[in-house]
Amino acid sequence: MSSTVIDRARPAGHRAPHRGSGFTGTLGLLRLYLRRDRVSLPLWVLLLSVPLATVYIASVETVYPDRSARAAAAAAIMASPAQRALYGPVYNDSLGAVGIWKAGMFHTLIAVAVILTVIRHTRADEESGRAELIDSTVVGRYANLTGALLLSFGASIATGAIGALGLLATDVAPAGSVAFGVALAASGMVFTAVAAVAAQLSPSARFTRAVAFAVLGTAFALRAIGDAGSGTLSWCSPLGWSLQVRPYAGERWWVLLLSLATAAVLTVLAYRLRAGRDVGAGLIAERPGAGTAGPMLSEPFGLAWRLNRGSLLLWTVGLCLYGLVMGSVVHGIGDQLGDNTAVRDIVTRMGGTGALEQAFLALAFTMIGMVAAAFAVSLTLRLHQEETGLRAETLLAGAVSRTHWLASHLAMALAGSAVATLISGVAAGLAYGMTVGDVGGKLPTVVGTAAVQLPAVWLLSAVTVGLFGLAPRFTPVAWGVLVGFIALYLLGSLAGFPQMLLNLEPFAHIPRVGGGDFTAVPLLWLLAIDAALITLGAMAFRRRDVRC
């Protein structure tokens, strides 16, 4: 039997797409990412660079006008394990060293920024199907990853360069200015690579963010514990390496090699892992689901719990560890600061009034509250992700009402952030109480200090719900609102912003616990604003179309 082979000629002018190398299309994707981030990218680059000279150095020149005042401040800082745990050590009494001491937190903030940026353009795009659509064009296997890396590496370098240039324009040593800028850029590059590796592990962007932030939280804890003690553990943390460069204190340039080598190794690992998986897949395989849904999944609240329980566990553990660190180092801070009234005034002003230990606890839990607010925003944004991922439409087409569906995710956000915050308060209270031998006396005060943060934490969830109902396309702007609040808190008083602007920051209205003059009025106002925004967002969601 003979067979006929039909050779179908291609239509004239038709060519099969030629992908070229694995990096084909990288520059085009980079331009796309720059366009998508044309607001957020310049914002965080400038926020993490410009204040170094205009706020930190300028404020130290005003508060500590001579070397003797700076020497007293530096001695007080180094005598306080709590201060070293929060911001790192200060290595001498020069204007540069004392001036950038609190900017040590910028190494953590740039890590947060690059993690969110990399995951937004890699795993989040794959999860939404955008990456698959792009890959249907002439784009190489590694173009997406390379574009995201170039974007974050470039932004990190720009942040360090702008910060260094600003410092060079002041009266501090040029070598220290360059060292701080390079160290800041190196921190961003390390965690850019961390996020790139995490993006290869799971099909879920939420899991990817959880892994990357778990690494960052571990790095921060190691750095904080190390700097509060002998300093040995700080060498196990990339955040510690950046501080060990010691700008303005006999710069140790060789330490930068640790960060650059780590970034290089992790970047190579990310490419190797990317080569071994398909678009949309992860190296950690998802467990197959059960044949039938359990009773919990038959209603929206159970589904919301199932979707978010992993995030709740990770964030709670992270805040609990931070609470343990803060609770264990707070005792004796008043004695350790000695008679330096300037430093006492700064710590008291940023944390409230009264005893310095209570003021430091208020400061520490304000930081915890801001982290919990980020967790609340993350959980509330699940509404937006479910809608844009077309999963909400399926649920709402059945017997589930819009109000019930929204309430399930909102309840998870409010309860989850409350649980994480209160457990961190319990951990800090136990550590503090055992240190002073008075658990029964200290635990209620510390837990109360944690609890009063909740109305401000919930405000960020309320803002997210309001945006989701009224302007769903702009729901992720809730992250920008949180960044604005944090910037006002960290920079507002130092930069001399008007009080009217400072009053917009919700954490500035948290009353002090344990001093005898507690007032609940600010908390009631915050709760009223929370309720109003949530009601407004829910009513708007009931009346608008579900986005497809």
Curated annotation (Swiss-Prot):
Q: What induces it?
A: Transcriptionally regulated by RaaS (Rv1219c). Expression increases in multidrug-resistant clinical strains (MDR-TB) compared to drug-susceptible strains.
Which pairs of positions does the record mark as disulfide bonds? none
Q: Where in the cell is it found?
A: Cell inner membrane
Where is this protein chiefly located?
A: membrane
What cellular-component terms does GO give this entry? plasma membrane
The answer on whether this UniProt entry bears the keyword Lipid biosynthesis reads no
Note whether Thylakoid occurs among the keywords: no
Tell me which UniProt keywords the record has, alphabetically.
Antibiotic resistance, Cell inner membrane, Cell membrane, Membrane, Transmembrane, Transmembrane helix
Q: How is this protein positioned relative to the membrane?
A: Multi-pass membrane protein
Transmembrane stretches in the record are 39-59, 99-119, 148-168, 178-198, 210-230, 253-273, 313-333, 359-379, 410-430, 450-470, 477-497, 521-541
Q: Name one GO biological process term.
A: response to antibiotic
Question: What does this chain do?
Answer: Probably part of the ABC transporter complex Rv1217c-Rv1218c involved in the resistance to a wide range of structurally unrelated drugs. Probably responsible for the translocation of the substrate across the membrane.
The record's subunit annotation is:
The complex is probably composed of two ATP-binding proteins (Rv1218c) and a transmembrane protein (Rv1217c).
* Protein's recorded name: Multidrug efflux system permease protein Rv1217c
Organism of origin is: Mycobacterium tuberculosis (strain ATCC 25618 / H37Rv)
